[in-house]
Amino acid sequence: MNALYNHAIKQRSLLNKDLGKFEKELVTAPISLQGAIATTLVSFEKTLHQYKEQYKQYQINSSDDNDETKLKYETRLQTLTQDYEDAKEKFTELKQKYSEINARDQLFNQQASMVEETVMNKRNINAPPQTSFGIGALDQNSERMTINSAAGLPLYEGLRKENSIFERGNAHLDRILQMGQESLEDIMEQNRVLQRLQSQMTKSLHVLGVSNETIEKINKRLFKDKLIFYIGLLLLILGIYFVLKWFG
């Protein structure tokens, strides 16, 4: 239990560090940081579940004169659980703020584009008629406006298109991260179900009088299934990591 507790402490420290960085650099933080926080949250939840299961087993197997030790483990579990809930809530709030800032910037860019187009249209409509006296000045002004338009508008349009591309890329990465997180949660839930089924099956087999050798064979088969499960989980995490590394 101490090893699991130390592992949970490291995960909590990493989570708080990433959340602090995300909060400090809310606008400029890379999308990969959100993926790292989501992955750490899922791993932290898994560690808490394992710690809770070991604590239950400790309560069953320990004697009654270890109340102080039980209280220590219970306090650790409550503290870690509360830290996990707080971190999860803070991450949700930061993602909401991040989305609001992006939406506001996008709206501002659209309004700026509309204002610029309106100004250019008014200039064209309100332009004075050309006279022989002002041909030279008009040609000079027209040339100057053409140069300014050629220098300014393409740059603005390029920045706006680049911003639009980044927004679409961020939205796509958000969907990928959400799918990965949901897949991890589904896998975690399936693992918990398998653990409960294994415990119930073992008890039922003992009640039915099945030999220990048969139960051991069943447990070996379950171990192989768990191994396949953890390999799949590792491949999924690696896939998410490479996606974030490639697009981040």
Swiss-Prot record:
GO terms for molecular function: SNAP receptor activity; SNARE binding. The gene is BOS1. Its main location: Golgi. Residues 248 are vesicular. One of its GO terms (biological process) is vesicle fusion. This is Protein transport protein BOS1. It is a single-pass type IV membrane protein. It is found in: Golgi apparatus membrane; Endoplasmic reticulum membrane.
